Amino acid sequence: MTLKRIFCAALALIVLQSVASAVDYCRLSCPEGRDHVGCRNAGFGAHCGSNPQTPKLHQEHIKMVLQKTNWLRGVVAEGSFCYPKAARMPVLVWDDDLANLASLHTKGCVTETNKCRSTERFHSPGQSSYEISGDTLPSAMDILNFALRDWYLQKDNLTRKDIGSYPAGEDKGLKNMANLISDKVTAIGCGLTHWEEGKLKRALFTCNFSSSNVPGHPIYQRGDNFATKCAKTHPYYKSLCNSDEHIKPNNNV
C-alpha cells in the first residue's frame, strides 16, 4: 500500500471516530456556580449584532483541522522547537459532542466565558478561541487556518519548563499551544459563527479539546525517544500513538 493510501485510510478513520449523541446537558456535572453552555441554549447571544450565522463545518474543514493539529503534535513529539520528545502523545480524532458545544459557545459571540463545557465522556475540556473582524471576512477555511496558525505561534511563549509543569496564574499567551500538544487530549471539535456590527463583520472560531491542562501537571510526558510508551503507533503519524490508545482524559479532574 502506498504512503498516500495509508494516509487517506488513516485520516478517514480519524474523521469517522466522531461521536454523535443527544445529551441533556442540564444534567451534566459542572463546577459550582457555572452554567453549562449546552443547557437551554438554542439561539444567538446578545452580543451577536445583526445577521448572525453558524455555518456547518464540512468534511474538508474537519480534515484540515485534523491534519494541521496532528502534524503539529507529530513534530512536537519528535522534539521540534527544542521541546522534549513525547513518550505517549495520541493522534487526535474529531468528536461531535465537543464540536456541538464549541458551536454553541461561538453563538454567544464572546471569546471568553466562564461556562461549563463538559460532555458525558470528557469532564473538563480545554478550549481555544480566535476572533477576526474587518470590512469583509475570509472564507471559513481561511479563518480556520488563521486560527490554527495563531495558536501555533504561541510556541514562542511556551518553554521546556512549561512542558514539565503547566504554569499557574495569568495566561501568558501559551494556553492555545498547550491545548494543541497535551498528551491527555485525544479528541477535538470546533465551531464557527459570524455576525455583523454596523459595517464591521466579525467571526468567532472555537475548538474544544477533550482534556484541559492543569497547573503543576506536565503538558505531556517526556521520553528518551518519541512514542516509546504507545501500545501501537499511528500508521502515518509515526511519532504519535494510534487513535485507539487507552488514554484517560479525566485523570486530572
From Swiss-Prot:
UniProt short sequence motif Cell attachment site, positions renumbered to this chain: 222-224
Summary of the function given for this chain in its UniProt record: Inhibits platelet aggregation induced by all agonists tested (ADP, arachidonic acid, the thromboxane A2 analog U46619, thrombin, and snake venom snaclecs (TMVA that activates platelet through GPIB, and stejnulxin that specifically acts through GPVI (GP6))). May act by competing with fibrinogen for binding to glycoprotein IIb/IIIa (ITGA2B/ITGB3).
UniProt entry keywords in alphabetical sequence: Cell adhesion impairing toxin, Hemostasis impairing toxin, Platelet aggregation inhibiting toxin, Secreted, Signal, Toxin
Pfam families per UniProt: CAP
SUPFAM superfamilies reported for this sequence: PR-1-like
Tissues of expression: Expressed in salivary glands.
UniProt superkingdom: Eukaryota
Gene3D superfamilies: CAP
Example of a GO MF term: toxin activity
Signal peptide start and end residues: 1-22
Protein family according to the UniProt entry: Belongs to the CRISP family.
GO CC entries: extracellular region
Residues covered by the SCP domain: 66-209
Name recorded for this polypeptide: Tabinhibitin 3
Cell location: Secreted
